[in-house]
Amino acid sequence: MRPSSNVTEFVLLGLTQDPDVKKTLFVMFLLIYIVTMVGNLLIWVTTIGSPSLGSLMYFFLAYLSLMDAIYSTAMSPKLMIDLLCDKIAISLSACMGQLFIEHLLGGAEVFLLVVMAYDRYVAISKPLHYLNIMNRLVCILLLVVAMIGGFVHSVVQIVFLYSLPICGPNVIDHSVCDMYPLLELLCLDTYFIGLTVVANGGIICMVIFTFLLISCGVILNFLKTYSQEERHKALPTCISHIIVVALVFVPCIFMYVRPVSNFPFDKLMTVFYSIITLMLNPLIYSLRQSEMKNAMKNLWCEKLSIVRKRVSPTLNIFIPSSKATNRR
């Protein structure tokens, strides 16, 4: 399927045209990307490999971290490469691919946060029935549903955009391909089209964000009936989830609950959502949860101990013992 357009390539103006600022941003994005990948993959490996994190809550956290790592890899390297180029050109198919991946993973993460909120609600409101309600099969099905939700949302965006005529010019004042910058290139009035985009993106974000805030309030209310020790154990998980929900949904609402328009501030918001937030998520979850920190410490100390035991005999072959040296 081809779009109703003669445009085959777009030129992105990027974040800035200042060479010095580009170099600074490149170094900053590279460091953030490394921290993001290390943090998210560390959580994923720790959650999968640590017996102490056998709770199904950490099952969802593991795949949220994996999703963030994939999202970061899909966005950050392209942004960093663009900072080294004088002209940022992207083909129509690559632009559509970037848009598809962005909304696929972003949509899946939104639905996964809903699933995680439901998981916490069941764990706190019905602790005796938790393992019956949230068994592993149910968790896998909910994870698949979250991915399908993101896929449907992304496909709707792409199919909708492909059916519209793009007249040009082919210059996009943005750092990535996104819906509103592309809609500004259309040959027709974008008012009603913008309402459709708001319905498929912004309103969904607002409704889910409101639902999640209410659910967090209900969960916090349930915690009042718990003992002080149980509250102290459950509260960091709830607070971490609330912070991550705010980091994900506030930029989404800002960018998609409005008429079709492209503001300079959108570039910073895109960087915050697609780079900064993905770095903060693992830090928030790991630093606020003692179970996660202890599991990381125990797992990696155990791994280092195993490596040390395997390496020591090999080193002893090459390093003569003190007794052998004295005999000589």
Swiss-Prot record:
It comes from the Eukaryota. Residues 48-55, 119-137, 218-233, 288-328 are cytoplasmic. Disulfide bonds join 95-187. The keyword Transmembrane helix applies. SUPFAM superfamilies: Family A G protein-coupled receptor-like (SSF81321). InterPro entries: GPCR_Rhodpsn, GPCR_Rhodpsn_7TM, Olfact_rcpt, Olfactory_Receptors. Odorant receptor. This is Olfactory receptor 4A16. It comes from Homo sapiens.
